[in-house]
Amino acid sequence: MAKYDLAIIGSGPGGYNTAIRASQWGLKTLCVEKDGYLGGTCLHVGCIPTKVLLHHAEIYDTFKRAKEFGIDVKEFSLNWPATLARKEAVVNKHAKGIEFLFRKNKVDKMQGWGKWAGPGRVTVEKDGQVTEIEATHIMFGTGSAARSLPGVEIDGKTILSNIEILQLPAVPKTLVIVGAGAVGVEFASVFNSFGTQVTVLEMLPRITPIEDEEISGELEKALKKKGIQIFTEAKVDSVKKDAQGATVSFTDKTGKSQSVSAEKVLMAVGRRPLTDNLGLEKSQVKLERGFVHTGPYMETAEPRLYAIGDIVAGMPQLAHAASMEGITCVAKITGKQIMPPLEKTRIPNCTYCEPQVASIGLTERAAREAGYAVKTGKFPFIGNSKATILGHHEGFIKVVSDEATAELLGVHIIGPLATEIVAESVAALQLEATVDDLMSTVHAHPTVWEAMADAVAAVRGLSINA
């Protein structure tokens, strides 16, 4: 029987990053993956291929505006097969990259279905053959799958999940998206750019409901301006397929019954944890609706059994959260680095629609509900010279701070390069920086990023460019 210090079930961002760091810190590590490739949902049917399409949409939109930049383009068109081919090339490049990194860092891998088989034991089943592994520590990072609504079956042809919409043979003329979280608005943005008539149905009062209310409102306004039809407080009653596609019937916010027909329907209503048939029901692990309860260092109620990523109760289902959860856990196991437990409010949210949205920390409402005396500052990108140069000056940065101490509580961005320029704010909150700390930080000019200097100054009523 093979023996390891750590066996990780799942090779998504959480699994593979943790496996490499564990090996770097001296643990003999095995990564078990049910599929024939490493990287998980994020790399193959999630974050990475979606961002390829979003970048292609951005380029396509730039061609539409070429005349504004003094460039005459007489004719251009979207080559969808070539777009899909590049998407696959990007995915394959990075899948091979993980294989290389495993070899470089001496991480063993094994394909098959991994299960907990008792303290210190894992079984891996493939093609009817079962291999037993002994491991001092066992970690599950098995990820999640798309949810649907009761009575609505994802058939992969007309009613789609995030997997099938990435592999469509042609760009649909019409598309209904059920759900307006990150997945919903990103695909709405992509296909709107490519000429699809898009309708978004959201059950809650606003789109991107985890974001600050002002950000959600600004994004809805921007998407509607692009021609995307959005219904909030829309309760889907049924999705019925027909020869032309499907018809989605829903009750709108006034109580009126409405329907919209489209070639394709994307279900973007959240994700369910993949914790069935892992042997966890035989352990002391506490499960709630399939999610695993963990302690501050991702430990479960079963000794030396850990959980990370989308299966963890109460934590965001984000690739970068999974990675840091695993690394923090391994730091604790090995004692190689002192790392504090991962805090939910220190995990950035990034949504790559157009305009982009990014945030870190508490929203204004959450800060007030937490009892803070809140002071905010806001700076519009229309006052930023680099944003004007780029031709993308919609949106703003909003800073939420504690009036008593000036500590940064949250930063919320909608606008150009939001998912990149949020990085300063992530570091600032991690270091418990204040408004004054960032006001005394030199921001390079001209950059989109320097808008942050004006946003924090706005908290003091001292913004220069607005």
Regions found by a protein language model. Name each.
Residues 111, 295-296, 402-403:
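Short, acidic, Ser/Thr-enriched surface-loop or helix-capping motifs
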Residues 9-14, 18-35, 41, 48, ...:
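Flexible, glycine-rich terminal cap/loop adjacent to redox cofactors
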Residues 155-172, 259-336:
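FAD-site-proximal beta/loop scaffold in flavoenzymes
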Residues 1-12, 171-178:
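Beta1/beta-strand and adjacent pyrophosphate-binding region of the FAD-binding site
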Residues 19, 23, 188, 192-193:
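Gly/Ala-rich phosphate-binding loop of Rossmann-like dinucleotide-binding domains
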Residues 1-4, 20-27, 33-171, 199, ...:
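Glycine-rich flavin
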